[in-house]
Amino acid sequence: MVSSIGLVVTSPLFLAIVIMIKRDSKGPALYRGERVGRSGKPFKIYKFRTMLVDADKMGGPSTAADDPRLTRIAGFLKKYQLDELPQLINVLKGEMSLVGPRPEVPMYVKMFTKEEEAILSVPPGMTDYASLWDFHEGEILRGSADPEKTYMEEIRPEKIRLQLKYVREHSIWVDLKIILKTLGKLFLG
């Protein structure tokens, strides 16, 4: 219901973003990436494309803000997390929730410890504690000689800790608090 309303309300913005992407670079406006959802079920996540076509074949899954695979408008879309809006489609399809641990790519899920597998016990979401902490992951990775190593050593452990915190604490009130904090970060910085 909420995702349906969100899609209707943001449809003019969707159209504007699609036009910007199509004018900026060749290829589809939407990117569909492989992610792992609740109970380890794979699904395709929708995002507005912020990278060159076939960028995932040119490098790893971690993306620094200065990654040469990024399109010209990627910075704008990522700054306001507009590239994430199509995930409302995933929410509508029941593959994701508004709040929950961000869905991971299969290669990272394969690295989960037994304890970390608890992350897969709840639906993945568009935002969570970890999203608030690493709001601009690309900026953290900017200038890194090895973005993947930086991600694995500096970002991933904290994301996992915060995702497990969400699994332990999740409730309607926690979800509401995370949504409000996410909106605050989006609009107030």
How should each PLM-predicted stretch be described?
Residues 121-189:
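C-terminal terminal-structure detector
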Residues 1-53, 166-189:
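A hydrophobic, helix-centered structural microdomain
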Residues 64-129, 177-179:
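A short, structured surface patch at a secondary-structure boundary
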Residues 31-69, 129-156:
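Short, glycine-rich, amphipathic interfacial segments at transmembrane boundaries or analogous
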Residues 22-23, 79, 91, 135:
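Conserved catalytic core of Hanks-type protein kinase domains
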Residues 3, 31, 71-75, 107, ...:
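Positions in alpha-helical segments
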Residues 16-19, 34, 108-109, 113-121, ...:
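Intrinsically disordered, low-complexity boundary segments flanking structured domains
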